[in-house]
Amino acid sequence: MGNDTIGSMITCIRNGNLSKAKTVEVPATQITRSIANILLQEGYIANVRERQYNAIRMLVITLKYQTKTRKPHITIIKYISKPGLRVYSNHQDIPQFLGEMGIVILSTSKGIMMHREARAQKVGGEVLCYVW
């Protein structure tokens, strides 16, 4: 998986959606837990649980699909701030998508949060990913 756990998580979710997988497993870190909890709160994924294999902890993310068409709830998930090029934004310049239909996940001094919370608390930070 490499050292870029956020990138690995986003890629696993994207590939799982494309292959219509029921679950995907990503390394359990504080950041991946926070991102998974935000996706769960917003209804983009069905469930998150933690599993341990010997000394390695993994998050098991249950993906969510529409019942009849089996289309994934996450249409697009895009990784923005990469290890080679960090992207930062203050609270006034945080992007919004499709008239608040999607979410922006940021890493701020107050933790990992969505764009709405960051604007309300007037904190900026590193733009991690877009989800819609």
UniProtKB/Swiss-Prot annotation:
Gene3D superfamilies: 3.30.1370.30, 3.30.1490.10
PROSITE patterns linked: RIBOSOMAL_S8 (PS00053)
InterPro entries in alphabetical order: Ribosomal_uS8, Ribosomal_uS8_CS, Ribosomal_uS8_sf
MF annotations from Gene Ontology: rRNA binding; structural constituent of ribosome
Assigned GO CC terms: chloroplast; ribonucleoprotein complex; ribosome
Cell compartment(s), UniProt: Plastid, Chloroplast
Keywords: Chloroplast, Plastid, Ribonucleoprotein, Ribosomal protein, RNA-binding, rRNA-binding
Family matches, as Pfam families: Ribosomal_S8 (PF00410)
GO biological process assignments: translation
Family: Belongs to the universal ribosomal protein uS8 family.
Subunit structure: Part of the 30S ribosomal subunit.
NCBIfam families xrefs: PRK00136.1
PANTHER family in the record: 40S RIBOSOMAL PROTEIN S15A
Protein purpose: One of the primary rRNA binding proteins, it binds directly to 16S rRNA central domain where it helps coordinate assembly of the platform of the 30S subunit.
Name of this protein: Small ribosomal subunit protein uS8c
Upper lineage: Eukaryota, Viridiplantae, Streptophyta, Zygnematophyceae, Zygnematophycidae
